[in-house]
């Protein structure tokens, strides 16, 4: 029985070599496609201030915040809820913002693709 399980695991298709980078690329392509820039405007109108406030709060509450640049990628579902929210590089500031961002609801995205990919590059300047 154990050997069957091992064989099944070995023959299962693996994850892509770099799923994060693939998701970022898909999000960038989606943003550049028809309807992408309009959705970006709606999204930032809804969460721009909230994102800034969350980022400032994360920095203020961490003992030695690592302000290195990072990228956040997420899937927006039809109802605006978020899934698969990930960051790279996973600094303390990035993971703090990731945890806050994951609970937010964004405007309903275009119907296609579903789920709708987004990516945000963060660069914190003094």
Describe every region a protein language model picked out:
Residues 12-126:
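Charge-biased low-complexity segments
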Residues 2-11:
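Sec-dependent N-terminal signal peptides
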């Amino acid at each position: 029985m154990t050997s069957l399980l091992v064989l099944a695991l070995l023959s299962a298709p693996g994850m892509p070599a770099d799923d994060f980078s693939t998701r970022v690329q898909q999000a960038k392509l989606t943003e550049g496609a028809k309807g992408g820039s309009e959705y970006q405007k709606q999204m930032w109108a809804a969460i721009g201030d909230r994102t800034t406030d969350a980022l400032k709060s994360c920095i203020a509450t961490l003992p030695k915040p690592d302000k290195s640049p990072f990228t956040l990628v997420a899937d927006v579902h039809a109802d605006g809820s978020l899934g698969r929210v990930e960051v790279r590089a996973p600094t303390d500031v990035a993971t703090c913002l990731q945890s806050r961002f994951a609970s937010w609801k964004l405007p309903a995205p275009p119907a296609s693709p579903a789920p709708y990919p987004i990516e945000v590059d963060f660069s914190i300047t003094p």
